[in-house]
Amino acid sequence: MTASTTRRTTAAKSRIAAAGAIAVAGAMLLTACGDQTDSGKKDSAASADTNKAPLFDQLPKAIQDKGVVKVGSDIAYAPVEFKDKSGKTVGIDPDLADALGKQLGVKFEFENGTFDTLVTGLRAKRYDIAMSAMTDTKDRQEGVEDGKKVGEGVDFVDYYTAGVSIYTQKGKDQGIKTWDDLCGKKIVVQRATVSEDLAKDQAKKCPAGKKLAIESFDNDQQAQVRLRSGGADAGSSDSPIAAYAVKTSGGGNDFELVGDTVEAAPYGIAVAKDNKELSAALQAAMNAIIKNGEYGKVLAKWGAESGAVTEAKLNGGS
């Protein structure tokens, strides 16, 4: 979203014989345009001056002026962010964003994108932040992907802790309890996630003749569909997402969790490295809602209290 600008148009020349009349008309037109511009500046200043949100002053001026934080998110990852039956974006992240907005005095607008393009969109300034159950890792902080430097990294405002879980069709766990048990089987995952990374690492460890087949999808819902139809032996996703799928898919009759949750790590709100002011404002706002209880209420609403943190930190991932 960009700030609105005053459109200036040139009026058609009047057929006025007297030069003095033309000069007067021109002066009036210039005066009118000048009034519009001054009024716009005053309105913007008045909006900033009258915003009573406790942390509004900590935001970058560009965010203050537009009154909106554009959020890149893969809105297909229940219960963190997803579309309800009416098409509304709901979940842990949207609810937390609403609470952050009250502290900062701006709106958070979610824009849907595939998970593996969110950081790219952040670098390209399509989004102000990425908030999408994104695990804070050193590689992402440093702009490293598959061992290669792909661009400038991002900063993270950490706000939740999640691990990685494996799940299977209900009653068909095939003896799967650990990642080693996946050798010789097929797993479905979402592309560019920690689950995909773990699956790739495990595939390298499997012996010849018992290779782990990996099928990656743009979103987790597609992976669940494949597993539900019998197209794979197991699926993997972040622990709150896997638990939610087990609880809700098919009324709780489609999937079951197997083995232990591994690789506990923080979720973080991703912010461009050159936007330290926004990172600091978001950290302050997150700590404010942790302190006032809004944070806990959101997690309780979605049954996600187990991953709660007591403090929002910057770049706490490893």
Where are these regions (language model features)?
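Bacterial lipoprotein signal-peptidase II cleavage site
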Residues: 30-45
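Alpha-to-beta junction loops
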Residues: 70, 106-107, 124-136, 185-188, ...
